[in-house]
Each structure stands twice: as C-alpha cells, then as structure tokens.
Design a protein with these regions (language model features):
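Conserved active-site alpha-helix within GNAT-family acetyltransferase domains
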Residues: 139-144, 150-169, 306-322
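Conserved beta-strand in the GNAT
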Residues: 75, 83-97, 111, 116, ...
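Intrinsically disordered, low-complexity, positively biased terminal segments
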Residues: 1-39, 50-53, 187-445
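Conserved acetyl-CoA binding element of GNAT-fold acetyltransferases
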Residues: 106-119, 265-277
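Conserved acetyl-CoA-binding loop-helix of GNAT-fold acetyltransferases
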Residues: 114-117, 122-139, 279-291
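Flexible glycine-/small-residue-enriched beta->alpha junction loops
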Residues: 163-195
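A short, polar/charged loop-to-alpha-helix boundary motif
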Residues: 98-105, 172, 262-270
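Active-site rim helix/loop that mediates acceptor-substrate recognition in acyltransferases
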Residues: 49-101, 215-240
Length: 445
C-alpha cells in the first residue's frame, strides 16, 4: 500500500538493487500505533547499531523527537513489502539544520544520520543507492552542503565527504590542589536538570553563533540534558547533575551537566555530559566548578575541542590527558559557489581550483576570488591543455574538509592528498580559509 507521503518504489532502484524497493517518508512524530512505518524504521536502526530497542512510551518519545527535527527517512525493503509491516534492510535519515560557517554566519546544511545496512545484505550497493539518491535530493532542494558524523572512518570519503572538525576524549586529574591560571567570575548555581528545558536551547544557540563548525542541535538533546528519557526510570531522572553559570549581573551565561560514576570506581569520577558556554568567563567558571567538586578525583569529558583551551585554563596543564582523538564533523560540498559565498573571510585572495567529484556535484575548475570578506566563485570550464590552469587540484572530499578552515590545505598537500601546480598555493588556500574562531562541532546528531 502506498501512503500519500510515501515515495512509491521506483523501477530504477530495482535495476540497481534487484528484488528491493526504496521508500521515502517523513518522521511524523506520531506514536508507534499511529505510524508503524516509523516504529519499524527506528527498531531497525537501533538493532543495526547494536543498541537497546525502545518500546512503549520510550519508543513514542523518540518518534516524537525525530518528528520535531523534521527528519525524512529512506528505507530499502524487500520488493513489494509494506513499510508498515516489514523491517527495512537499509535505513537513512536526512534533515536540515544550520551549519555555523563563521561567527554569526550560517548556511542551511543537509544533515545525515541513522545510516545502516543489515549485516545480511552488505556489499550489494544499498548504502550507495541511498546516499546518492538523497544527495541528489539535497541538491534539488538548493542545499549547498551536507554533513554527517561517521561510525567508521573509511566509509564516506567515496561519496565526497571530508573531515572538517575533530574532538578529544580527555581526563582531568583533580586530586589535591587544582588552580586556574585566571580567577573565575560570576556565580555557579546547582539546578534541577529539568530547569534546562528552556534555558539550555537558548544558551546553546548563543554559543552556536560563536562556534564555526557547529550545527543546530537535534531535539533529543532537550531530553538528554533534562534527564527525562522515558527508557530510563520512566523519565523521572537518573541522577544527572546540572550547574548554571551566571555573570556578575545575574544573567545565565553557560551550563554543564555531569554524572557521578559510582563509589565502586577506584578513582571517584564524574563524567561531563553537556558543557555550553557563551563567554570565555563562563567556560572558565564552569571548569572551576568541575575541578573543585568535593570528593572527586577525576573529571572525564568526551567532547573536548582540539584547541587545548582546557589545558591553558589550568596552572598545571599536565593534569589533562587526552585518551582519544577522533574525527567529528564530515562535510560534503554540493554547490561550490553557494558554499564559499556563505562563509566569512579574514583576508583577500584569489586561487583557481580544479575539483574532481565522483558524483559530479562539485566537479569543475573554479576561480575563488575573495575581496573585502566576500567570496565569488565562478566556473572556468575544464582544466588541462587549452583550458584553465589551476593552482591546485583536489578531490571534493579534501575541498569539503578544508572549507571551514579547521583543516589545513598545506598539511593535506604534505600528506599527498592534493596537488599543487603553483608553489605556495596550498599555503595560500590555508590562509584564505582561516576561521575567525577555533573550528569545532559542539554536538552530535
């Protein structure tokens, strides 16, 4: 049965995926009983990620949150199967959120999430079919860039995605006397996590505006930071702690959530959940609070930036240990002129870039001209004999990775990931794309 919001199974998909159909439908936000397609979709996603599958009120809560995000789902099914009665073999979600390209500068981005393929159907082209179809759809909608976070680092480059931001997992030794390099100001107030329902999103949006590389948050964070997941203690809370920083005038400027890991641990530890600061003073005050928690000897944080600000907050930077560093945000440019016109610049410059793109969206030779903080990108046709002479040749994955300025084009040249036709061109591109603030993605999706 084809519902009004379905995309009917298409014969071209069956040509690529024999015996399979592709369906597309929105996350309505309705309970599972009213939207069994989405209930089965979410169940498949959780199983394919080896997660616990929610049911009852917990499942309905997740469905409602995904509806608030405006997600559109794609599922690959056995031929002629009804998505309301069959589990999808492949899953994919896409939705639009703002990408911060500079301070107070945003572009709408196509966010990709919940991409899975059942283990029994690997290497049949299911992922490629879903990804290419949805990137085509994003282009048709006029979205200049796509974004995702990758469960595996070797999957998405083939589709033109490049790493644009990184994050660290850190441990802070708080035993003994810990001091900050500069005194904190304002005050810290402990609050019930549920008090963050309104305050949290407002502060996040203010921090977002100052953080190139971050994206608008998904609705699930309002539940995570208020400790109200129905799958855990029926939404009544599980011991999450929350603290809000107020400046000297009493205005909230930031907040942090954290959880004690238990007295059975050899070293008494708290794990930071979410830390949002809209000012440098707020960031300093929140860490002043965390490193001076009574009885605690270690603070763990799984979403630390690469900028080493945390180390510089402390008089003893060796108290901070990085236990893991990994890629966070992957970007994929879909419209070269729109993407580069949609970010700020700190200097003037001009470069000719020859871009290869296996999907064709960004392919071509482009002149990037920046004057007075504004970029204009024009196509020059094919490079090579008789055509435009590029300064650099690179794949769209590399172009997407360096786009925000958090990844160096010069380092990619040294790694052999791009080709320089004019000496110094990679360093020029690095300088031209330098960000106005450290590039970091504050959130997952």
């Amino acid at each position: 049965m084809t519902r009004p919001t379905d995309t009917p199974p298409s014969e071209p998909v069956r040509e690529v995926l024999p015996g399979l159909d592709l369906h597309r439908f929105p996350a309505t936000g309705h309970p599972a009983e009213q939207d069994p397609r989405m209930a089965r979709m979410l169940t498949a996603v959780e199983r394919n990620f080896y997660e616990e599958v929610p049911s009852g009120a917990a499942l309905d809560q997740v469905l409602e949150l995904h509806g608030r995000d405006g997600r559109t789902y794609v599922g690959v099914y056995e031929a002629d199967a009804d998505p309301a009665e069959a589990d999808p073999i492949g899953t994919y979600a896409g939705f639009t959120k703002p990408l911060q390209t500079g301070v107070n500068r945003q572009l709408d981005a196509f966010l990709i999430s919940e991409v899975t393929v059942r283990s029994t159907h690997r290497r049949r082209g299911i992922l490629r079919t879903m990804m290419e179809a949805e990137l085509d759809r994003a282009v048709a909608q006029g979205l200049p860039i796509a974004a995702l976070s990758a469960s595996e680092a070797t999957i998405y480059r083939r589709f033109g995605f490049g790493v644009a931001t990184h994050r660290r997992v850190v441990e802070v030794d708080t035993a003994g006397e810990v001091s900050l390099a500069a005194a904190s100001t304002g005050s810290i107030r402990m609050v019930d996590p549920k008090d963050l329902a309104d305050l949290g999103p407002a502060l996040y949006d203010r921090a977002l505006a100052q953080t190139p590389g971050s994206v608008g948050r998904v609705a699930a964070y309002t539940v995570t930071e208020t400790d109200s997941w129905r799958s855990k203690n029926e939404g009544k809370g599980t011991g999450l702690l929350a603290a809000v920083h107020h400046d000297d005038g009493g205005t909230p400027r930031g907040y942090v959530t954290y959880r004690f890991t238990g007295w059975d641990q050899k070293v008494p530890t708290v794990k930071v959940g979410v830390l949002v600061a809209t000012t440098a003073a707020s960031h300093r005050a929140l860490w002043d609070h965390l490193v001076h928690l009574d009885l605690i000897r270690r603070v763990e944080w799984g979403f630390a930036p690469e900028d080493r600000l945390l180390e510089n907050l402390l008089t003893d930077p060796r108290r901070v240990t990085t236990t893991r560093s990994e890629d966070q945000l992957w970007l994929r440019i879909l419209d070269v002129p729109a993407a580069f016109a949609g970010r700020p610049y700190q200097r003037d410059g001009e470069l000719v870039l020859a871009v290869t793109d296996p999907l064709g969206h960004a392919a071509g030779t482009w002149r990037l001209l920046v004057r007075d903080g504004t970029a204009a990108v024009v196509p020059l046709g094919e490079s090579g004999p008789g055509g435009a002479r590029p300064d650099l040749s690179l794949d769209v994955a590399e172009l997407s990775g360096v786009y925000l300025g958090g990844v160096s084009a010069e380092l990619l040249r040294q790694a052999g990931r791009l080709t320089e036709h004019r000496a110094g061109a990679a360093a020029e591109l690095t300088a031209l794309l330098a960000a106005d603030r450290p590039v970091f993605c504050m959130t997952g999706f």
